[in-house]
């Protein structure tokens, strides 16, 4: 899956999970600061990404995923 395809899928999931417009979801968007996610939202978002991409994101890795771009890079690395 290309980086662009991953970004589009992540953008769609983030927009749905956080009830924000997909246009607001940019690679540099921070889940908490820019998109208004709280800690529970973040956990649910990680679970949704795991399910959508059929990957496992350990807690240690999830703590380092703070932006949309971080999520895309992590998923891209897991699929390589």
From Swiss-Prot:
Top-rank lineage group of the source organism: Bacteria
GO cellular component: cytosol; membrane
One Pfam family this sequence matches: PP-binding
Subcellular localization: Cytoplasm
UniProt keyword annotation of ATP-binding present: no
Modified residues (O-(pantetheine 4'-phosphoryl)serine): 39
GO biological process: lipid A biosynthetic process
This protein's record includes keyword Cytoplasm: yes
Residues in coiled coil: none
Residues of the Carrier domain: 4-79
PTM entry text: 4'-phosphopantetheine is transferred from CoA to a specific serine of apo-ACP by AcpS. This modification is essential for activity because fatty acids are bound in thioester linkage to the sulfhydryl of the prosthetic group.
Similarity comment text for this entry: Belongs to the acyl carrier protein (ACP) family.
Role summary: Carrier of the growing fatty acid chain in fatty acid biosynthesis.
Protein name per the record: Acyl carrier protein
Gene this protein is translated from: acpP
């Amino acid at each position: 899956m290309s980086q662009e395809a991953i970004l589009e899928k992540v953008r769609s999931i983030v927009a749905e999970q956080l009830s924000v417009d997909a246009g607001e979801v940019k690679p540099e968007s921070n889940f908490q600061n820019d998109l208004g996610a709280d800690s529970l939202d973040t956990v649910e978002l990680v679970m949704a990404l795991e399910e959508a991409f059929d990957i496992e994101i350990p807690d240690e890795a999830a703590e380092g995923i703070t932006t949309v771009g971080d999520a895309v890079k992590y998923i891209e690395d897991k699929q390589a």
